[in-house]
Each structure stands twice: as structure tokens, then as C-alpha cells.
Swiss-Prot record:
Residues 131-371 form the VWFA domain. Residues 731-758 are annotated as: Interaction with HAX1. GO terms for molecular function: integrin binding; metal ion binding; molecular function activator activity. This is Integrin beta-6. It comes from Cavia porcellus. Gene3D superfamilies: 4.10.1240.30, Cytochrome c1, transmembrane anchor, C-terminal, Laminin, ligand-binding face of the semaphorins, domain 2, ntegrin, alpha v. Chain A, domain 3, von Willebrand factor, type A domain.
Length: 788
């Protein structure tokens, strides 16, 4: 017993108690109500554990209850647990008796769950070797499948031969389908009804829905004989009644011959789509498919013209319920359509069928090998409101979260699945859930039972003396009062109560409207927001102001509606820090000397100042230059400043200090050029009161006075020298010009040559002129003749 208590002790300490007071705030007054709050809550049934008015304090986390003084034996805290009822080991190798095969473990268990908690269990699946196989060949016998029918006449022998390599226990059967024999799916003239192929012309069977022709048998020759006797039929529209046939083949277990301990393969062969659901309303058929077997004495579907086609959902339910694995062998045009169907139907596969079904044997073998390489779980039963999640642990321990399927498994390998189950509440009683591998008959049956009651509820003291003269029943540490009585111990009568003592003032509501008056004392209500307290329930710790959504800015405690700030914080919202670290500028001054530090932020007071530490101020004077008048006056006074210097320093807001003991790290170094061209250096610092102090004033690099005589002498000599140089240059230019002119003259004189002819300047004394009015001789003769 001691070891068990020790184990429970550590279990309680490890439970979730991260929400302080979260259980107590819900105000649970009974053990059952406490458990419904959450899996982290427990109830203390110890007598006199809390103040009579604090019944809800009994509901808390286990760790908090232990800290309050509740003994471990009185803590009611049912935990989720798994109780395995049946767990046979998985079968290994070949089994002589198929009934002894175990392919899933465990097989039966009870799962007790606290609402809000979860429990994880491991499920293992191993497909056994040489597992029996039942294969039912369901063929479309519409006219377009004529060549396919001829191809499979020897399929039975070939299929049995190939399957014998995979299993020693193989059976096969045969069935066929066409379409519902009603208009508009077929022609209704007497000739067309008797022979739907009369227009070809060709003799074929009348249209039929589904025929079960050969039950499952291990006689392959019998299968061949049956197939050879089959004839085609015909219908009008392209979709066929294949889903009607699948439904009957799945649910007519006895007539088909499905065994309990075998792999059920249904090979569906067609070259067309299938009708489903309400397609039959075109023929006036409105009765929903009931999902039951309706094969008559001739093994034909008797309700083909009465019931609708099954819906996809109905088909999935019946196929899964009867562990049937569908293999859709369809032509190229139909593959995409049936792949969509296969995605909805667990365990279904799709294979490409050649036009004449020439590859049907290889298609079946490949589909069988694919199905045997996959392990997939499916969940059946009452799962409404139940939360289940799966994690597949496949080859080499590889984890696949949120998956319940393992691929590329070899027969004999084990696939594990971690199944996590939880329930949200206690609204429903026990549920029955089944987890099984797709296509296999082995199942894991789970009874999910909610843990919503306490053991102490089974022990009730009616009219107990612990409840004030037997005025109530004592259960789980508290009293449930009889009618007419109330109070923690049923000590108060309802007809004698007065609420005056529970009012702060006569015009105030009882217990401030936030509590109940029991026997003249306020029992404050519990609130999910915090604690309500005070003699009149007038105080709480959650009605204070908030900053950025946080109570008292998360920097203080709410006491009776007012924020009490913690150290380092102030203000109504406790959002104002008293620290000035964030206000110190790079030069070490508070807000650069241009503002005040308010709530950890600089409030700039100088006009034009801005920035986090008021460091930017285009209109502000230079902090060094603004002290110039004080500094220069101090230097000119040779260390003995007068009243004029004191006024200038006071106006500049500085104090001159000769002390050498000061912090140079927080000081600002300044350099100014004085009126005498000297370099003035000094340090500026700020004391604790924010006053500016100047240290270490000094002058250096002062220029010497100029030598006037030497400057004048130098200037005079320079002027004289410049004049001489200019005169020399002028003389050189004139000489050069004269030389050039003389040379030119000499050159022209040497070229002159005087001739001995007439003087070109001489003019003769006689001049000859031509009379422009003179006429020629002919003209003169004419004139003379005229005169004569």
C-alpha cells in the first residue's frame, strides 16, 4: 500500500498544474463537477480541509492540494488507463489452421479516459504467410465485352496455377452484370427485349442486372466451363449497373461463399462507367438501396427494377464491413474515373485492362501483390465525438505522423501504429470502437469508457451528524443540504436568514452583488478573471486599469481595484519606469541637456530638439560654443573672475570647477578658438542635479605677434624687385622688336633691282584721244550722195 501511495504521489506532482488556481476559479461544488473542468483538476474529500465558505478550494491541481495540506489518500483524481483483455501473439510463418491465425494485436481492451486527457496505445499488424484467398471475378457482359469473354475462357486454369505460387488455399468464383432491365437503360420493344442485339444482327441474352453464376470453388476447370457458356447482352447508355453487382457480391456472403478467414478479392472487369445513387430516378425507381442481399432462387438480383443504385457511401460501408478488396480492371478511358473511386474505397486498386482483356492474369497478380504489400487501418463503430490520431511506424522504425498506412511491406513484417484517443466531455456513455486492417477479418475491439465520477461518491452518509443535526448528506467532504437548509454545514434555515449584515450600506446590494449571504456572512463568488474578496465582496484583483491589455501594465498588483506598482515603476497604469538609463545620450548627459526624462523616455523641452535622447536640434546652439563668453572671461581674469564673469557664467548656466576629482568618462570634451587665436580646451559634465560644470580650462597653441619692420622691409624689397624685373622684361621686348624690323628692311633692300628703261615716273607731253562721234567712210559717202 505504501508503494502505491508513493507512486500516486509522484503521479500527482507531475500532472498539469501550470494554470494557477485555474481549477478553483471554476467554482466546482461537487467532486463530479471538479473532474469535468479538466484532466489537471482533482478533488480533496478530507473532512474540514478548507474554511466552510471555501468549498470550491477543494478543487485544484494535485500538487496544490498537497501543498494546502490535503492527505494523498483523500485526493480524488482518476487517471486515464488502458486495460488489455485479450492479447494473443501475432502469428509467425505458415499456419495449418486458418482459424488460429492472428494478424493484429491486441485484440480486445478497455480504455478509460478522463475528459480532456488523451491515452496512446500501440497496435501491431503482421500479415501471415500462405493466407487463404477467395477471388470473385465480376464481369461486364455488355456487347462491347465480347472479345474479352473469349479471352478469359482458360483464365481459371492459368489463374489457379499462378496463385498457387502465392498461396496454397485459393478459390475463385464468377458473376456477371449488364444494366437494370428498364427504360431508358434498354429498348422496350418486344424484339429488343427478347434480343437486345437484334439490330446488329446478333443473338444475345436479354438485359439483366446481376447474375451470380459460380460460387467460390477450388475447381479451376469448373470455372473455365462456366465462362465458356456465357453469352453477352446489351443496353442503351454507356454507364453500366456495376455498382449494383458489387453490392450484391459483397453482402451475399453465404451464396458467394466468402470464408471468414481468407482474403476477399473482388475483380471488377468493365470498359464503361457505372451508375450510382439517384441515376435510377430516370427510370422512376425511387426506393433507396437497402444494402441487403436480394439474390433469388436463380441467383439473380431480384430488386434490380425496384431499388436505386447504391451510393458511393453505401458501397464503401458494405465493402469495408465484409472485408472485400476491390480490383478495378478497366480500359484506358475509364482509368482516371475509377482511380477517383479507389481513393474513396479503402483497399481498392485500379489496373489498366487491354481491349481484349489479354493482360487480365498479370493485372490480377500485380494487384494482389500490391495489396499484400500495404497495411492500412480503418476505424469502425461509435466514433462520434471521439478524437483519434494515428502515427504509423513502418519499415526500419520510420515514423509517419497522421498516417494509418504502411507501404512496401513484406509478408511477415510487422507494422506498428500509435493510436492516440481522447474525449472532450462526459455527455455520452461507453462507446464501442473497432480498429482493423483493411481487407482482413482480424479486429481490435475497444470499449471507451469515460472517467467522470469519484470513488468517494459511492459512500454517502444520509442525514449525517457532520451536517448540523443531520440537515444534509455528507459526501466527498462536503454537505448536500436537505430542502429548507443551506450553508456549508447546513446550519442556516432559509426562513430565518437576513441579508442586512451582508450589505456595506443599506442601499448597496447584498455582498456587492458578487457573493451569497450565508448565515450573515458573504461567500464571494468565484470568477474566471481572478479573486473576489472582502467582507462585502467589494474588492477584487482584476478590475484595475490595463495598459496594452495587461493588468497594471504587468508591472504591479491589483489590490481592491487599484494598481500597486512594483519597485521601479510608477503611474496610474504602472507603465512608467523610474529608471533614466534609456534617457542618457551618447555624450553622457540626460536627454542631451535639452529635455526631461519622463517614464524612461526623453521629453524634449528645448525648441527644435528631437530624437530619442533629444540629440537632434538644428536650432540649438553648440553646447561648447554657448559657454564661450564665460570661458573667455574666466581666462582673461587670470583665475580671479569678477562679478562680470560670474554673471556671464550664470547666464550660460554653467559653473567653473577647479576640482580634479570628477568622472572623465561621462564628460564632454570641447575645443574653441579664442579671440587671440589661442586654442581653448575644457571638459563639460553634469552633476546629479543636472547642472553643467566646466573643468580643466586651458589655452594652448597661441600664435606669436607679427614683426612689423621685417614685414615692411620685405614688402618694399618685393616691390623693388618686381619693378626691376618688369623693366628688364620691357627692355627685352623692345630690343627684340627693333631687331626684327631691321632684318625686314635689309631683306627688302637686297631684293630691289633698277632697270635702264624709261623712267616709270615719266609722263610725255603729247596725248592722243579718239573721237567717239566719228563715222566710217561708207557713212560719209552716203551723206555726200544725198547732198548731190
Amino acid at each position: 500500500m505504501g508503494i502505491e501511495l508513493l507512486c500516486f504521489f509522484f503521479l500527482f506532482l507531475g500532472r498539469d498544474d501550470h494554470v494557477r488556481g485555474g481549477c478553483a476559479m471554476e467554482g466546482a461544488e461537487t467532486c463530479g463537477d471538479c473532474l469535468l473542468i479538466g484532466p489537471q483538476c482533482a478533488w480533496c474529500s478530507q473532512e474540514n480541509f478548507t474554511h466552510p465558505s471555501g468549498v470550491s478550494e477543494r478543487c485544484d491541481t494535485p500538487a496544490n492540494l498537497l501543498a494546502k495540506g490535503c492527505q494523498l489518500t483523500f485526493i480524488e483524481n482518476p487517471v486515464s488507463q488502458v486495460e488489455i483483455l485479450k492479447n494473443k501473439p501475432l502469428s509467425i510463418g505458415r499456419q495449418k489452421n486458418s482459424s488460429d491465425i492472428v494478424q493484429i494485436a491486441p485484440q480486445n481492451l478497455i480504455l478509460k479516459l478522463r475528459p480532456g486527457s488523451e491515452q496512446t496505445l500501440q497496435v501491431q499488424v503482421r500479415q501471415t504467410e500462405d493466407y487463404p484467398v477467395d477471388l470473385y471475378y465480376l464481369m461486364d457482359l455488355s456487347a462491347s465485352m465480347d472479345d474479352d469473354l473469349n479471352t478469359i475462357k482458360e483464365l481459371g486454369s492459368l489463374l489457379s496455377k499462378e496463385m498457387s505460387k502465392l498461396t496454397s488455399n485459393f478459390r475463385l468464383g464468377f458473376g456477371s452484370f449488364v444494366e437494370k432491365p428498364v427504360s431508358p437503360f434498354m429498348k422496350t420493344t418486344p424484339e429488343e427485349i427478347a434480343n437486345p442485339c437484334s439490330s446488329i444482327p446478333y443473338i444475345c441474352l436479354p438485359t439483366f442486372g446481376f447474375k451470380h453464376i459460380l460460387p467460390l470453388t477450388n475447381d479451376a476447370e469448373r470455372f473455365n466451363e462456366i465462362v465458356k457458356k456465357q453469352k453477352i447482352s446489351a443496353n442503351i447508355d454507356t454507364p453500366e449497373g456495376g455498382f449494383d453487382a458489387i453490392m450484391q457480391a459483397a453482402v451475399c456472403k453465404e451464396k458467394i461463399g466468402w470464408r471468414n478467414d481468407s482474403l476477399h478479392l473482388l475483380v471488377f472487369v468493365s470498359d464503361a462507367d457505372s451508375h450510382f445513387g439517384m441515376d435510377s430516378k430516370l427510370a422512376g425507381i425511387v426506393i433507396p438501396n437497402d444494402g441487403l442481399c436480394h439474390l433469388d432462387s436463380k441467383n439473380e438480383y431480384s430488386m434490380s427494377t425496384v431499388m436505386e443504385y447504391p451510393t458511393i457511401g453505401q458501397l464503401i460501408d458494405k465493402v469495408v464491413q465484409n472485408n472485400v478488396l476491390l480490383i478495378f480492371a478497366v480500359t484506358q478511358e475509364q482509368v482516371p474515373l475509377y482511380e477517383n473511386y479507389a481513393k474513396l474505397i479503402p483497399g481498392a486498386t485500379v489496373g489498366l485492362l487491354h481491349k481484349d482483356s489479354g493482360n487480365i492474369l498479370q493485372l490480377i497478380i500485380s494487384a494482389y501483390e500490391e495489396l499484400r504489400s500495404e497495411v492500412e487501418l480503418e476505424v469502425l463503430g461509435d466514433t462520434e465525438g471521439l478524437n483519434l490520431s494515428f502515427t504509423a511506424v513502418c519499415n526500419n522504425g520510420t515514423l509517419f505522423p497522421h498516417q494509418k498506412k504502411c507501404l512496401h511491406m513484406k509478408v511477415g513484417e510487422t507494422a506498428s501504429f500509435n493510436v492516440t484517443v481522447s474525449i472532450p466531455n462526459c455527455e455520452r456513455k461507453s462507446r464501442h470502437v473497432i480498429i482493423k486492417p483493411v481487407g482482413l477479418g482480424d479486429t481490435l475491439e475497444i470499449l471507451v469508457s469515460p472517467e467522470c465520477s469519484c470513488d468517494c461518491q459511492k459512500e454517502v452518509e444520509v442525514n449525517s451528524s457532520k451536517c448540523h443535526n443531520g440537515n444534509g448528506s455528507y459526501q466527498c467532504g462536503v454537505c448536500a443540504c436537505n430542502p429548507g437548509h443551506m450553508g456549508p454545514h447546513c446550519e442556516c434555515g432559509e426562513d430565518t436568514l437576513s441579508t442586512d449584515s451582508c450589505k456595506e450600506t443599506p442601499d448597496h446590494p447584498s455582498c456587492s452583488g458578487r457573493g451569497d449571504c450565508y448565515c450573515g456572512q458573504c461567500i464571494c463568488h468565484l470568477s474566471p478573471y481572478g479573486n473576489i474578496y472582502g467582507p462585502y465582496c467589494q474588492c477584487d484583483n482584476f478590475s484595475c486599469v490595463r495598459h496594452k491589455g495587461l493588468l497594471c501594465g504587468d508591472n504591479g498588483d491589483c489590490e481592491c481595484g487599484e494598481c500597486v506598482c512594483r519597485s521601479g515603476w510608477t503611474g496610474e497604469y504602472c507603465n512608467c519606469t523610474t529608471s533614466t538609463d534609456t534617457c542618457i545620450s551618447e555624450d553622457g548627459t540626460l536627454c542631451s541637456g535639452r529635455g526631461d526624462c519622463v517614464c524612461g523616455k526623453c521629453v524634449c523641452t528645448n525648441p527644435g530638439a528631437s530624437g530619442p535622447t533629444c540629440e537632434r536640434c538644428p536650432t540649438c546652439s553648440d553646447p561648447c560654443n554657448s559657454k564661450r563668453s564665460c570661458i573667455e572671461c574666466h581666462l582673461s581674469a587670470d583665475g580671479q573672475p569678477g562679478e562680470e564673469c560670474v554673471d556671464k557664467c550664470k547666464l550660460a548656466g554653467v559653473t567653473i570647477s577647479k576640482e580634479a576629482d570628477f568622472s572623465k568618462d561621462s564628460s564632454v570634451s570641447c575645443s574653441l578658438q579664442g579671440e587671440n587665436e589661442c586654442l581653448i580646451t575644457f571638459l563639460i559634465s553634469t552633476d546629479n542635479e543636472g547642472k553643467t560644470i566646466i573643468h580643466n580650462i586651458s589655452e594652448k597653441d597661441c600664435p606669436k605677434p607679427p614683426n612689423i619692420p621685417m614685414i615692411m622691409l620685405g614688402v618694399s624689397l618685393a616691390i623693388l624687385l618686381i619693378g626691376v624685373v618688369l623693366l628688364c622684361i620691357w627692355k627685352l621686348l623692345v630690343s627684340f622688336h627693333d631687331r626684327k624690323e631691321v632684318a625686314k628692311f635689309e631683306a627688302e633692300r637686297s631684293k630691289a633691282k633698277w632697270q635702264t628703261g624709261t623712267n616709270p615716273l615719266y609722263r610725255g607731253s603729247t596725248s592722243t584721244f579718239k573721237n567717239v562721234t566719228y563715222k566710217h567712210r561708207d557713212k560719209l559717202k552716203t551723206d555726200l550722195s544725198t547732198d548731190g
